[in-house]
């Protein structure tokens, strides 16, 4: 039996989120609806999640001593990493000492904080199909890896980055240095290390949201959401939709891969598993042990969206991955580099049939920063995609004044 206390009282069930962007914000809202006291942590003030949490804290989450001091001061029962750039060895230490439970596990947070840990787990430990790859610490190593078998075209990504930052495709030798420089500019840490992957000529890519939650017998069960299709530009999601049709054999393979990876990572919660698909073939790409940006579409499509699934699973509550309606999401970009922007056209966006708009409340806009998302429902995915893109195009961020 799960017992939940009263927020802001001695009986409170306290959950701390490390990272409070738009995904964390929705997790915080889902937790609060279940009576949880929430603590939103980020590296800058007034992050989206901090605007809705009971408590807002700003620290350098990659600093182990700052992280340790905050957890010991706040005393949450659960710590939920929502980004990669965290001092995960400290989380492992605190979890091992019984100070706090990390979601899904501190080991999972460490392995997924960069592309190297999770790729080696999937390909080398679990033997799952992936693209051919090499890790490189210099421009010279990158060129050697490409010449030594990776070949062209190929994709270069920083070992640690998010939302496609620093990711590019190389079509020939003339693009290698530019790709290396772009990866160095887009990574989250100062030391330069990249993964170079052979390009897979896939038909489409999906996100398979995978939930590890307690069943009626108290044991962890694995459930899958309906596949989510998405379009990425330079590694960053621009639209997604659900359901995405798949050959039954490909779906079975995708679920096998997702189950293998998430079972090894362990714990409870929702995982976003990214996969490439060609016909009946499926390749593992990446996994995030938390809600996924492409999964924002589930706010339109599922009875329990990905954030509610994550909140329920980590609290030991039952979950349902049932689909409610076909739907789609489309990103609203900042368009300008400015603080405190204003948004025109929200009324026009909401006149598009069966649409919703989510503005994230980020204090600073950049031209390619995700500032909101349009959601749409329809009887079929194609109509939903058209509506979501139309609604997103209506919303125009601009400099205030």
Swiss-Prot record:
In terms of Gene3D superfamilies, this protein maps to:
3.40.50.20, ATP-grasp fold, A domain, ATP-grasp fold, B domain
Extract the signal peptide range: none
Give the GO terms filed under biological process for this record. 'de novo' IMP biosynthetic process
What keywords are assigned to this protein? Answer: ATP-binding, Ligase, Magnesium, Metal-binding, Nucleotide-binding, Purine biosynthesis
Q: Where does ATP bind?
A: 115, 157, 162-167, 197-200, 205
Q: Please tell me whether the keyword Disulfide bond is annotated for this protein.
A: no
| Residues annotated to bind Mg(2+) | 274, 286
Assembly behavior: Homodimer.
Question: What function does the entry list?
Answer: Involved in the de novo purine biosynthesis. Catalyzes the transfer of formate to 5-phospho-ribosyl-glycinamide (GAR), producing 5-phospho-ribosyl-N-formylglycinamide (FGAR). Formate is provided by PurU via hydrolysis of 10-formyl-tetrahydrofolate.
- Which family, according to UniProt? Belongs to the PurK/PurT family.
HAMAP family per record: PurT
The protein in question is named: Formate-dependent phosphoribosylglycinamide formyltransferase
Organism per entry: Cupriavidus pinatubonensis (strain JMP 134 / LMG 1197) (Cupriavidus necator (strain JMP 134))
């Amino acid at each position: 039996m799960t017992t939940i206390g009263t927020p802001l009282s001695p009986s409170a069930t306290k959950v701390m989120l490390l990272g409070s962007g738009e995904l964390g914000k929705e997790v915080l809202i889902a937790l609060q609806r279940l009576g949880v006291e929430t603590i939103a942590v980020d590296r800058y003030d007034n992050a989206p999640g901090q605007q809705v949490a009971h408590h807002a804290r700003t620290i350098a989450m990659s600093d182990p001593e700052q992280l340790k001091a905050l957890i010991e001061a706040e005393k949450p029962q659960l710590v939920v990493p929502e980004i990669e750039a965290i001092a995960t060895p400290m989380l492992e230490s605190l979890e091992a000492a019984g100070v706090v439970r990390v979601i899904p596990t501190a080991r999972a947070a460490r392995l997924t904080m960069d592309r190297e840990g999770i790729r080696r787990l999937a390909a080398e430990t679990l033997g799952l199909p992936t693209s051919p790859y090499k890790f490189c610490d210099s421009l010279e190593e990158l060129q050697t890896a490409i010449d030594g078998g990776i070949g062209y075209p190929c994709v270069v990504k920083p070992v640690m980055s998010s939302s496609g930052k620093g990711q590019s495709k190389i079509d020939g030798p003339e693009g290698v240095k530019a790709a290396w420089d772009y990866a160095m500019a887009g990574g989250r840490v100062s030391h330069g290390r990249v993964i170079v992957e052979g390009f897979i000529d896939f038909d489409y890519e999906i996100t398979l949201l995978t939930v590890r939650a307690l069943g009626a017998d108290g044991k962890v069960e694995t459930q899958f959401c309906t596949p989510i299709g998405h379009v990425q530009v330079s590694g960053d999601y621009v639209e997604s939709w659900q359901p995405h049709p798949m050959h039954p054999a490909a779906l079975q393979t995708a679920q096998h891969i997702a189950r293998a990876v998430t079972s090894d990572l362990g714990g409870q919660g929702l995982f976003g598993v990214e996969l490439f698909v060609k016909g009946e073939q499926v390749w593992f790409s990446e996994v995030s042990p938390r809600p996924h940006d492409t999964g924002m579409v589930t706010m339109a499509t599922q009875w329990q969206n990905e954030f509610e699934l994550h909140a329920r699973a980590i609290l030991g509550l039952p979950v349902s991955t049932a689909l409610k309606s076909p739907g789609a999401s489309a990103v609203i970009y900042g368009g300008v580099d400015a603080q405190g922007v204003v948004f025109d056209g929200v009324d026009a966006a909401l006149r598009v049939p069966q649409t919703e708009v989510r503005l994230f409340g980020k204090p600073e806009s950049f031209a390619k920063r995700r500032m909101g998302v349009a959601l749409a429902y329809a009887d079929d995915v194609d109509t939903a995609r058209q509506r979501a893109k139309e609604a997103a195009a209506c919303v125009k961020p601009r400099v205030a004044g």
